[in-house]
């Protein structure tokens, strides 16, 4: 499985459209504590975008306006034309650890004409958004999910993400080690064995991993195992099954680490989340 698919499958993000049509009045957007992101796609017309900092920019051609963590922003539509636009929220799984939410810049404004695949997806998206067909909302959300994948590809290929897991996945050597951790969490990984996966020397791998990911390999491995443990416990697996799946010798060892990291025992976590 390719690295981006692995992240999307594991962490997940889902688009939910809340407006399609001509925006003709001033509108403010905000999310409490960055719980959701905002994705806007301008089809035609024009608007002024006012960001949280107070900066103002004119947007008058097909454009993607993306606030991954729901930063406060305002749209002031052109009084003559308004703005034909699709607006959606983004719901993240495991928000506190979701690398998609954490890694992206707080604001992205991307012109459609600069990215050849954008118009191809958006033509189908706009056909649904500005129609009255049955199943319209569900279809829009599916196209938005596809469009989000293309946005993430653009960010990775153009190095708009510089730190964190997503940046690591854009590095072909580090990506090998990250995919190994994600797909084989039960293995007894060490810096040496991960460096071998990355085809790098031990010292160079450790330094590069820390610089790009922002964590040591051991710290990242621990975080990943705890993310998996939470997911498996929520799905009803026994503590013994979870400990085996993520590489602990026994359930007691896993329970000690789990409580140290999360402040609650695996059994209590499972009871609280069933």
Residues covered by each model-derived region:
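A short, N-terminal "cap"/entry segment at the start of jelly-roll beta-barrel domains
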Residues: 1-17, 28-30, 106-110, 131
């Amino acid at each position: 499985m390719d690295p981006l698919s692995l992240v999307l499958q594991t962490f997940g993000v889902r688009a939910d459209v809340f407006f399609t049509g001509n925006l003709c009045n001033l509108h403010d957007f905000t999310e409490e504590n960055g719980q959701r992101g905002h994705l806007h796609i301008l089809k035609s017309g024009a608007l002024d975008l006012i960001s949280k900092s107070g900066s103002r920019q004119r947007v008058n051609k097909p454009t993607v306006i993306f606030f991954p963590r729901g930063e406060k922003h305002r749209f002031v539509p052109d009084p003559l034309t308004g703005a034909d636009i699709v607006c959606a929220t983004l719901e993240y799984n495991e928000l506190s650890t979701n690398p998609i939410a954490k890694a992206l810049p707080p604001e992205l404004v991307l012109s459609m004409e600069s990215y050849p695949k954008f118009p191809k997806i958006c033509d189908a998206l706009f056909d649904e958004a500005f129609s009255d067909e049955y199943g319209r909302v569900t279809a829009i959300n599916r196209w938005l999910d596809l469009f989000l994948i293309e946005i993430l590809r653009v960010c990775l290929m153009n190095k708009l993400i510089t730190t964190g897991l997503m940046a690591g996945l854009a590095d072909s050597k580090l990506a090998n080690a990250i995919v190994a951790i994600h797909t084989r969490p039960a293995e007894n990984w060490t810096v040496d064995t991960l460096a071998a996966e990355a085809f790098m020397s031990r010292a160079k791998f450790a330094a590069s991993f820390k610089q790009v990911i922002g964590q040591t390999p051991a710290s990242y491995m621990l975080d990943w195992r705890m993310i998996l443990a939470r997911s498996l416990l929520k799905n009803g697996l026994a503590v013994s099954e979870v400990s085996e799946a993520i590489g602990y010798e026994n359930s007691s060892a896993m329970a000690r680490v789990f409580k140290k990291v999360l402040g609650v025992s695996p059994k209590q976590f499972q009871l609280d989340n069933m």
